[in-house]
């Protein structure tokens, strides 16, 4: 079933009024003058506004995502909607009710948003691991899937300006980071090393930060939200990206990167679930299998840092959201260099 498209632009400066103008095209039973609105402020790529009938329940919430400025340069919005259409019947994503010129309307997933503290809870972490395994088991649409992280980084480099128009940004970039050409050669070298790991390519979320994970206490289950970066990628990349996000976004603290004992428990839960889904009789992964995935995940953490570092450079140029993307890029790329030697030296005997 195709998603209805409404020829309408949502006003990021006055979203409530522009939502009222089209609400009856989405839900005819709703009264535009009897709605309560609330804005989610955590996102740094898009603007997200929710509404429901005044005094209504969380189950009645409609979400309106307004795309960030120029995000269409690096996010395939048609593919994003197609991903929701695939995941919704499987119970992994809410329904999409309508698309607009600069966004879409979709359902709300009830539960509590995770944070760097709650995501470390052993029980919740195990639920997340199993859910990630479920996502990775989804059949890919591509016949010969290739890792998207590297292709995306190359694209990012093509749209980063050679020089930031803002003098302060340009000076800060030159002061702290290497040139674009140097960074490009660095990521090519990284890819050549990671390709040797031959981590299986799967359907990957690719943005498993804490606030994209919802825990439903009543059902004792987790789900993931926001699939704009979902694409084929190595298993180890998606898990590594999740571990990197333990550090948070607004106030990044990489001392929160999970220690080995936590990672091992997560990876054991992941592998057990993956084995169940594959119909294996023995669903107890060996210590060697866990150690191998541990090594792969930590080496792919370098790719995740590089991806979001270069992404931050793109956003520093194009985004109109009040967030210091350049400092975020610097933080991620610095973390890449700090971890590089240690992670690439890991081996699984």
Curated annotation (Swiss-Prot):
Keywords: ATP-binding, Cytoplasm, Kinase, Lipid biosynthesis, Lipid metabolism, Nucleotide-binding, Phospholipid biosynthesis, Phospholipid metabolism, Transferase
InterPro entries, per database record: Kinase-like_dom_sf
Spans traversing the lipid bilayer: none
GO CC annotations on file: cytoplasm
Catalytic reaction annotation: ethanolamine + ATP = phosphoethanolamine + ADP + H(+)
Function noted in UniProt: Highly specific for ethanolamine phosphorylation. May be a rate-controlling step in phosphatidylethanolamine biosynthesis.
Protein name per UniProt: Probable ethanolamine kinase
């Amino acid at each position: 079933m195709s998603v209805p498209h409404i020829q309408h632009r949502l006003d990021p400066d006055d979203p409530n009024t522009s939502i009222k103008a089209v609400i009856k095209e989405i839900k005819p039973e709703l009264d535009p003058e009897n709605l309560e609105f609330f804005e989610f402020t955590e996102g740094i790529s898009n603007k997200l506004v929710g509404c429901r009938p005044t005094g209504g329940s969380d189950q009645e919430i409609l979400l309106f995502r307004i795309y960030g400025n120029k995000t269409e340069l690096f996010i395939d919005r048609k593919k994003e909607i197609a991903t929701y259409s695939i995941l919704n019947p499987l119970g992994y994503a809410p329904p999409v009710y309508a698309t607009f010129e600069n966004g879409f309307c979709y359902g709300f997933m009830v539960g509590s948003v995770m944070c760097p503290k709650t995501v470390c809870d052993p029980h919740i972490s195990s639920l997340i691991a199993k859910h990630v395994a479920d996502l990775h088991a989804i059949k890919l649409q591509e016949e010969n899937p290739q890792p998207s992280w590297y292709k995306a980084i190359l694209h990012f480099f093509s749209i980063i300006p050679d020089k930031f128009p803002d003098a302060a940004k340009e000076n800060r970039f030159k002061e702290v980071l290497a040139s674009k050409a140097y960074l490009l050669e660095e990521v090519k070298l990284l890819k050549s090393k990671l390709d040797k790991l031959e981590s299986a390519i799967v359907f990957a979320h690719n943005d498993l930060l804490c606030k994209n994970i919802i825990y439903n206490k009543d059902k004792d289950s987790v789900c993931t939200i926001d699939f704009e970066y979902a694409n084929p990628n190595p298993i180890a990349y998606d898990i590594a990206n999740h571990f990197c996000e333990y550090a948070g976004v607004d106030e990044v603290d990489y001392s929160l990167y999970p220690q080995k004992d936590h990672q091992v428990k997560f990876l054991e839960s992941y592998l057990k679930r993956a084995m169940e889904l594959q119909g294996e009789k023995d669903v107890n992964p060996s210590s060697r299998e866990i150690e191998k995935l541990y090594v792969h995940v930590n080496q792919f953490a370098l790719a995740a840092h590089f991806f979001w570092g270069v992404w931050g450079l793109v956003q520093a140029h194009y985004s109109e959201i009040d967030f210091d993307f350049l400092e975020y890029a610097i933080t991620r790329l610095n973390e890449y260099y700090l971890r590089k030697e240690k992670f690439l030296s890991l081996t699984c005997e």
